[in-house]
């Protein structure tokens, strides 16, 4: 039994075996967190009521098996976000790219997350959702309004091992059209240890 455990341990350390991760889905209410979670879980698009209580799902994407927590985005739900920061491997922060009036509020919440010491080394995938709606913000516009124009790390494979730079990138997506978020998850998965 020891040899088998050792062998699987070696495979896992080389990134050749399935990784496990805890991922938080955060963002303001109506950004698409629950819709994304259900799309990833069983590829179904359903109208959802606003999330009132934290929910979790176990999912697999590629070689990563992860437990995803949808914590809700309304003001009362945001108070419990901090309770879930322990041992988190990545944060997926969704922004409604069409609802430009709430960009300042979304920036405020994102800034609070990015400045929280317990999340200092956690990779952040920021998804600008609802790009299928006419007049939704462009990626550059969203970066500007979130104050991220000079703070993202690049969409390719960037070696950040020896730096104190947190992986952080913006990807635009449309959950209802099933586009964009796959590239984002592929990007963030390379930083999940």
UniProtKB/Swiss-Prot annotation:
Classification via Pfam families: Arf (PF00025)
Keywords annotated in UniProt: Cytoplasm, Endoplasmic reticulum, ER-Golgi transport, Golgi apparatus, GTP-binding, Hydrolase, Magnesium, Membrane, Metal-binding, Nucleotide-binding, Protein transport, Transport
Gene3D superfamilies, sorted: P-loop containing nucleotide triphosphate hydrolases
InterPro entries, sorted: P-loop_NTPase, Small_GTP-bd, Small_GTPase_ARF/SAR, Small_GTPase_SAR1
Residues that hold Mg(2+) according to the record: 29, 70
GO molecular function: GTP binding; GTPase activity; metal ion binding
UniProt catalytic activity: GTP + H2O = GDP + phosphate + H(+)
Its EC number(s): 3.6.5.2
Membrane topology, from the record: Peripheral membrane protein
Annotated binding of GTP, by residue: 30, 32-35, 129-130, 132, 175
Residues annotated for GDP binding in this entry: 30-35, 129-130, 132, 175
GO biological process: intracellular protein transport; pollen development; vesicle-mediated transport
Chain's role: Small GTPase that cycles between an active GTP-bound and an inactive GDP-bound state and mainly functions in vesicle-mediated endoplasmic reticulum (ER) to Golgi transport. The active GTP-bound form inserts into the endoplasmic reticulum membrane where it recruits the remainder of the coat protein complex II/COPII. The coat protein complex II assembling and polymerizing on endoplasmic reticulum membrane is responsible for both the sorting of cargos and the deformation and budding of membranes into vesicles destined to the Golgi.
Protein name according to UniProt: Small COPII coat GTPase SAR1A
Gene: SAR1A
């Amino acid at each position: 039994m020891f040899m088998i455990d050792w062998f699987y341990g070696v495979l896992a350390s080389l990134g050749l075996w399935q990784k496990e991760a805890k991922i938080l889905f955060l963002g303001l209410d109506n950004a698409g967190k629950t819709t994304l979670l259900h799309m990833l879980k069983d590829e179904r698009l359903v109208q959802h009521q606003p999330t009132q209580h934290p929910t979790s799902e176990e999912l697999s994407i590629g070689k990563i098996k992860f437990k995803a927590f949808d914590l809700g985005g309304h003001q009362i739900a945001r108070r419990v976000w901090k309770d879930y920061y322990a041992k988190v491997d990545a944060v997926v922060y969704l922004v409604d790219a069409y609802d430009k009036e709430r960009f300042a509020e979304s920036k405020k919440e994102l800034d609070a997350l990015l400045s929280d010491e317990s999340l200092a080394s956690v990779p952040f995938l920021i998804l600008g959702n609802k790009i299928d709606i006419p007049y939704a913000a462009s990626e550059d516009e969203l970066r500007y309004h979130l104050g991220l124009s000079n703070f993202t790390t690049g969409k390719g494979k960037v070696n950040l091992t020896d730096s104190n730079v947190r992986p952080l990138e913006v990807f635009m997506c449309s959950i209802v059209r099933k586009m964009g978020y796959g590239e984002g998850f592929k990007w963030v998965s390379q930083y999940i240890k």
